[in-house]
């Protein structure tokens, strides 16, 4: 999104393997210790959660969030945040981080992921 709206930015790496997402300074920006998170240094605002970040950047730039299509955009954004993202995340967790530990979880999230990709 930052590239699309041609906004200058600086990346700060957060090493999840070192649990840097739990440090006090990062939690001031992202209270749930999740990435992504951004700071707009021009106005001192910070945002966490991808949906909130995308809406902020779209409103800031005046792109990708026009009023004529906002209801449709919001529906797909909420579908990604509440269903698609979490379900694909669970699939990834069971199949890539803990394979073979829960046959039920692996089968369930594989089927859900397969359904999501077919519907999209």
Regions found by a protein language model. Name each.
Residues 1-111, 115:
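GST-like domain detector, emphasizing the conserved glutathione-binding G-site
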Residues 117-120:
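Alpha-helical transmembrane segments in multipass membrane proteins, preferentially the mid-helix core
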């Amino acid at each position: 999104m930052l590239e699309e709206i041609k906004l200058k930015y600086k990346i700060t790496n957060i090493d999840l393997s070192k649990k840097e997402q739990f440090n006090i300074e990062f939690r001031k920006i992202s209270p749930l210790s999740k990435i992504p998170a951004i700071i707009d240094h021009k106005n001192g605002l910070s945002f966490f959660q991808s949906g909130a970040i995308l809406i902020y950047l779209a409103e800031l730039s005046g792109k990708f969030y026009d009023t004529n299509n906002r209801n449709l955009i919001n529906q797909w954004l909420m579908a990604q945040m509440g269903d698609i993202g979490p379900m694909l995340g669970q699939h990834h967790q069971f199949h890539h981080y803990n394979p073979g530990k829960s046959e039920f979880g692996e089968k369930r999230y594989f089927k859900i992921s397969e359904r999501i990709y077919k519907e999209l």
